[in-house]
Structure formats: C-alpha cells, structure tokens
Amino acid sequence: MEQEFVALGHAGSDAYAGLETFPNPGVSVVELRSDELTAVCPITNQPDFYVATIEYRPKELCLESKSLKIYLSRFRDQGAFCEALAVQIRDEVTAALELAHEDVDVTLIQKARGGITITASV
C-alpha cells in the first residue's frame, strides 16, 4: 500500500497536518538542516533568524522533509527565546518519531543581532 503525505506536493502551510513520517528504510542516523527558520524575540518583537540542525537516530520512523519545512515555518510569527525554541522542536520531533529524547539532537544557531550569536543545543 502506498503511503499518502498531506504536505508533500502541496504549497504553503495550508497543507500542514503535523510532522509526517515514513517507515525507516534502514538508515542509522539522519541529519536535517535548514536556514529558513525564523521567530520573533518575545521581548522586542524583532525577527530572529536561525540555522536549525536536527539529527536523530531513527528506529521505526523517519521524518518527511516537506512536513518539517512547513512545521518550521509556523514559528515565523511566534515569540520565542532561542533556547526554548530548541527544546520545543526537540520535544515535538521526538514525539513524532516515537523516540527517546536522547535519540534526537537539535541545534539552533541564532544569527548575530547586536553582535551576539546564540547557539542552543539539546
């Protein structure tokens, strides 16, 4: 039976149905990286730009990348500190993949603002 994806093949966040997964074809480590993650500072409401790296050691499931792209775009207008955002992403990816926290690593690098770059890893 062919698996159907909600996000794949659809434009924009209207197709967002959560983080979608597919059966692990046998890989032991997956790394996904995006430089399209944005959020806003919860204090100043100024935009923050991130490079996000998600590395996980799959068991039964892998993340479908288009659903991840749409998932990350949902943070665009949300206020969040870098550190809290890293934890939230790790927790939601962990839940979608049905893994333990130690099987998922998330690193966010917040691009410099005011001369300071922040890196948060969980």
Question: What is the predicted role of each segment?
Answer:
Residues M1-V122:
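N-terminal intrinsically disordered, cationic/polar leader segments
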